[in-house]
A protein has these predicted regions:
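Membrane-interface helix-loop-helix junctions at transmembrane boundaries of multi-pass membrane enzymes
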Residues: 2-4, 107-115, 162-163, 199-211, ...
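Extracytosolic helix-loop segments that constitute the early lumenal/periplasmic catalytic or substrate-binding loops
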Residues: 17-20, 35-61, 68-71
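Short periplasmic/luminal acceptor-recognition loop of GT-C membrane glycosyltransferases, typified by
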Residues: 23, 389-396, 404-456, 481, ...
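Short acidic/glycine- and proline-prone juxtamembrane loop motifs at membrane-interface regions
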Residues: 29, 133-143, 344
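Loop-to-helix entry region of an early transmembrane alpha helix in multi-pass inner-membrane enzymes
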Residues: 67-71, 79-97, 134, 138, ...
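Membrane-interface alpha helices of multi-pass inner-membrane proteins
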Residues: 122, 149, 166-182, 218-219, ...
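Hydrophobic/aromatic-rich transmembrane helices and adjacent perimembrane loops
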Residues: 141-147, 186, 324, 331-367
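Membrane-lumen/periplasm interface segments of specific transmembrane helices
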Residues: 208-276, 292-299
């Protein structure tokens, strides 16, 4: 193993240890519970179902996200348990593998990475606030990023040597990518388009590469569709794709009412959901929201200055430099994603990773700029440490103690906020996360856990509690409370019991 590889492994292990000690500083949130509730039920109850999802096109809630991450998480839970630290640590492993794939990508470029360039790369990968937030929660974004890196490595091998094995690798990587998240498919297609434009002299190999990628997508996406069809949720799956893309939503709002008139079905439930989820922000406002990604913009500005200083006498050489092209793609990515749909914080890896590669390539070339980037990386890591500090939403150990001292039975039905997910799931087989799950599907509840000082996603639990309080046949009794975080446990009983 080379010095640079040793450096990456040792620094990454240090970050992993720090993260394992601080993962509970970020309380469970809506996306995390939505993704992992299905995985938990599959791992410990053998059922692919959830009580932490929303109703789609009038059907009972069902997880309509491509299932690869949930399947991986279910296997992980079976092996390592379902505690917060155990489950979230899967993303630490995926991030470590992602970094290794990126380093391999650069070595395939013929680069001899210095120790300091590797330190720079590792600090920016693990230490920046946006990346730390992404790998510290239970979303599937690190899996998507890793599979994108894997697909790029497979594509580079294919472009270097077109053989049956490299063709199969591209198809397999593309199929797996489609099963991990359709946003990653859009991203890989955008990257291919950028490379196709940038490498005009190699357009025929790139066209053949596109055919292989599309073959992989045509295997992966139908596999997901068949999975949804087997569970009777194909229409819900298609609807969930449309409703989270601004472009497809606008098109659907035009096409669906027309299709309803022609085919004779009620289009109102579909259009109502689309209107509910369609962003109220204009395209200009969505583009301006990119400015909130400050660390990315600052690092991009420093990187641009570095490349201009190295190529100030030759624009042609600048535009043909691989590192500068990565910088350009990183800058284009937020714009493309906004035009395609949206660019929330958990998609920021799409812009950050090509920028990280661009920075590292420049650091290898210039010791002066390597020093400048290292100063920036240490500064950004110092600010990034804040994401590892308590999130200000309460002491998680208090929450653990609060849930642990209750006498719940496996058969109890509990309505609760997302924050108690990891603690309540092992205790009760039926837990409704009413922050998103429609309460009309809850036939009864034995206990309700309210978070009075919670966020907007905790309010539906309070609304459900107030609804039961208004029922004259029920007795609602507060039996325990917790402070920091603020939680109240209510027992629900029929008056004749």
């Amino acid at each position: 193993m080379s010095k640079s590889s040793h450096t990456y492994v040792l620094l990454s292990l240090a970050f992993i240890i720090v993260n394992l000690l601080t993962l509970n500083h970020l309380r469970p949130w809506i996306d995390e519970v939505m993704m992992l509730d299905t995985a938990y039920n599959a791992a410990f109850h053998g059922r692919w179902e959830t009580t932490a999802w929303y109703r789609v096109v009038g059907q009972y809630p069902f997880p309509t996200y491509p299932p690869l991450y949930q399947m991986l998480a279910a296997a992980w839970m079976r092996l390592f348990g379902s505690s917060l630290v155990a489950v979230r640590s899967i993303n630490l492993l995926l991030t470590f593998l992602l970094g290794g794939a990126c380093l391999r990508m650069m070595k395939r470029q013929g680069l001899a990475l210095s120790v300091w360039a590797t330190v720079l790369f590792t600090l920016l990968l693990w230490g920046t606030g946006e990346m730390a937030w992404m790998y510290r929660n239970g979303r599937p974004d690190m899996l998507c990023a890793l599979l994108v890196a894997t697909a790029i490595l497979a594509a580079r091998r294919y472009l270097a040597s077109e053989s049956p094995s490299t063709r199969i690798a591209v198809i397999a990587a593309s199929a797996a990518l489609a099963c991990s998240g359709l946003q990653a498919v859009v991203y890989l297609c955008a990257l291919w388009s950028f490379c196709f434009i940038a490498h005009r002299e190699r357009r025929k190999p790139y066209i053949r590469l596109l055919v292989l990628m599309l073959t992989g997508f045509s295997l992966g996406i139908p596999s997901v569709a068949l999975f949804m069809l087997a569970h009777g949720r194909l229409v819900a799956f298609a609807s969930s794709i449309v409703q989270y893309s601004a472009t497809l939503s606008s098109l659907a709002l035009t096409v669906v009412p027309w299709a309803g008139d022609v085919l004779g079905f009620d289009a109102a439930p579909y259009t109502q959901k689309l209107l509910q989820l369609t962003t109220k922000m204009s395209l200009g406002q969505r583009l301006l929201s990119i400015a909130a990604y400050r660390s990315f913009l600052i690092l991009a500005a420093i990187t641009l200055a570095a490349y201009i200083s190295c190529y100030r006498n030759s624009l042609r050489l600048l535009l043909s430099d691989a590192g500068f092209l990565m910088w350009l793609f990183a800058l284009c990515t937020p714009i493309v994603m906004v035009l395609a749909g949206r660019f929330p914080v958990y998609y920021h890896w799409m812009a950050f990773l090509p920028l990280l590669l661009s920075v590292t390539l420049m650091a290898v070339r210039s010791r002066v700029w390597c020093a400048v980037f290292c100063v920036a990386a240490f500064t950004m890591s110092a600010f990034g440490i804040r994401s590892m500090l308590p999130d200000g939403q309460g002491d998680y150990s208090r929450l653990q103690s609060f849930i642990g001292r209750q006498a719940f039975k496996k058969s109890d039905v509990v309505v609760c906020p997302f924050s108690v997910f990891y603690e309540i799931k092992p205790l009760c087989d039926t837990c409704y996360f009413a922050g998103i799950f429609p309460t009309e599907y809850i036939s009864h509840a034995d206990y309700i856990i309210e978070a009075p000082d919670g966020d907007a996603y905790d309010q539906p639990v309070t609304d459900y509690l107030n609804k039961l309080k208004a029922d004259s046949t029920l007795t609602i009794t507060a039996i325990d409370t917790c402070e920091n975080p603020s939680l109240t446990l209510y027992q629900v009983k029929k008056k004749h019991e």
